[in-house]
């Protein structure tokens, strides 16, 4: 049967490298996150209303009156956090082990990253709290930095002259449909991956040593699922508001700006890069480039080795990059004052320098050391 054949060749008889580590678990974990988000989101949508007058109340109603509504709501909110943790780990794995040399798979991955970020942003607007409203206002307003068409574009997206009813309704519509587009893209992502098969930690072709996906990696994925669900439940049942902003428990008020407008933690690194450039258009470009720079990475790969496993200089740079991203995440949540401004600017410059200049340079040195 053709459908069973696809399932069999993707999940059961798939030849898989025998030495892939836990860093290869995040793909399936992202799949699990997507399923959790679609299911919890579907049940939330059954009780949510996307009108400015009732949106905030409908979320309160879900938490207070719907059976296990509080659980569904917090699973969905914190599920997004787990989604991004897995996403960043997955991308980091790709950079470390040179998986980006699978160009089609990598590029669809970048499109997926953008799609998930767009979905999360629009989802954050839906509860219609203070941070929802002002986050939507600030981020959509960035498009006005586009020369000539900017202002028209922003008003077109808003459906008026400010973030209002029309904006909320369309954001709900987009937030509902995007996850299904993401699911379709995931299939394409996997289709391209299965053309080549998985990479492995050594970066050396493993065609001579493949094992069937089932039972070896089905059981390994199942363990990953259990760990993810455990962590998600710990978050949801013990401190569901740990990662949220208390301002979002205040209903949206266009006449009152919150003291610190900031996105959810998973966007803070990009927000810090955006703010560290004292020019609107420049900031927007830096913001887009902070993710789009991933598309350039494959073309800067000049090392004779694929993986960083045996490249100590590149390894150090990689972990400095991780530390730098954590620094940017911290700065994104701080007010725009001394010394945070300078730290943010240094961290932003370092971010692009490591990826575009220092890593290729390190590869060059490593090639020389190995007399290649």
Swiss-Prot record:
Residues annotated as binding a ubiquinone: 194
Note on how the cofactor is bound: Binds 2 heme b groups non-covalently.
Swiss-Prot/TrEMBL cofactor(s): heme b
GO cellular component, one term: respiratory chain complex III
Transmembrane segments: 26-46, 70-91, 106-126, 171-191, 219-239, 281-301, 313-333, 340-360
CDD domains linked: cytochrome_b_C, Cytochrome_b_N
Main location group: mitochondrion
Keywords assigned: Electron transport, Heme, Iron, Membrane, Metal-binding, Mitochondrion, Mitochondrion inner membrane, Respiratory chain, Transmembrane, Transmembrane helix, Transport, Ubiquinone
Gene Ontology biological process terms from the UniProt entry: mitochondrial electron transport, ubiquinol to cytochrome c
Residues given in the record as heme b b566 binding sites: 90, 189
Pfam families for the chain: Cytochrom_B_C (PF00032), Cytochrome_B (PF00033)
Signal peptide stretch: none
Compartments in which it is found: Mitochondrion inner membrane
Entry binding sites for heme b b562: 76, 175
Family per record: Belongs to the cytochrome b family.
Job of this protein: Component of the ubiquinol-cytochrome c reductase complex (complex III or cytochrome b-c1 complex) that is part of the mitochondrial respiratory chain. The b-c1 complex mediates electron transfer from ubiquinol to cytochrome c. Contributes to the generation of a proton gradient across the mitochondrial membrane that is then used for ATP synthesis.
Name of the featured protein: Cytochrome b
